[in-house]
Amino acid sequence: MNIFRFAGDLSHVFAIIILLLKIWKTRSCAGISGKSQILFAVVYLTRYLDLFTTYVSLYNSVMKVLFLATSGATVYLMYVKFKATYDHNHDSFRIEFLLVPCALLSLVINHEFTVMEVLWTFSIYLESVAILPQLFLVSRTGEAESITSHYLFALGSYRALYLLNWVYRYMVESHYDLIAIFAGVVQTVLYCDFFYLYITKVLKGKKLQLPA
């Protein structure tokens, strides 16, 4: 495993920790898109169905369990334990507009037309756009709390580092995956405007605001 993938995984785990601590400490999920969290849960469920059938390494298995458990915990906290604090009115993105195209695309463009491979491909496509409801929520409310901004930055950094991981693997191993690379580019592009605002505002102690 190369340093870029490891750093990306750490950034991903850090983002999850920030999110869960934010919800638990404030006893509120205000400012967090439950729809994005549902999409991420679907991503992990469809990607890691091979958890009990395919063993790669202890590290790989631990990360799979971690992402499945934390995504489930996040959805539980938002829709059950702290349901009263969830902003239903602003979190109004139509996620079927993401789910259906990703499902259709995974049936048409995949590495192999098998159930597991199609589901894996679906998870890759869906992850690339799963953050859209969160960005839409921030845009509708007009601003994001600093802790939410840190969460989004860590999540975006994870994907950017994974792109570097693919560059490294191509240069060192002559290995590449066009589906993963394309989805990673799409996801990173979605974060670009946020990255700019994060660096120019949040790091200077100002509130992050996205254009409506």
UniProtKB/Swiss-Prot annotation:
Family of this protein: Belongs to the ERD2 family.
Function, as annotated: Required for the retention of luminal endoplasmic reticulum proteins. Determines the specificity of the luminal ER protein retention system. Also required for normal vesicular traffic through the Golgi.
Gene Ontology molecular function: ER retention sequence binding; KDEL sequence binding
Name of the protein in its database record: ER lumen protein-retaining receptor
Cytoplasmic side: 22-35, 81-96, 138-149, 200-212
Domain of life: Eukaryota
Lumenal face residues: 1-2, 54-61, 111-117, 169-178
Signal sequence, start to end: none
Localization per record: Endoplasmic reticulum membrane
Transmembrane segments: 3-21, 36-53, 62-80, 97-110, 118-137, 150-168, 179-199
UniProt keyword list: Endoplasmic reticulum, ER-Golgi transport, Membrane, Protein transport, Receptor, Transmembrane, Transmembrane helix, Transport
Membrane topology (UniProt): Multi-pass membrane protein
GO cellular component: cis-Golgi network; endoplasmic reticulum; endoplasmic reticulum membrane
Gene from which this protein is expressed: KdelR
GO biological process assignments: protein retention in ER lumen; protein transport; vesicle-mediated transport
Primary localisation category: endoplasmic reticulum
Record organism: Drosophila melanogaster (Fruit fly)
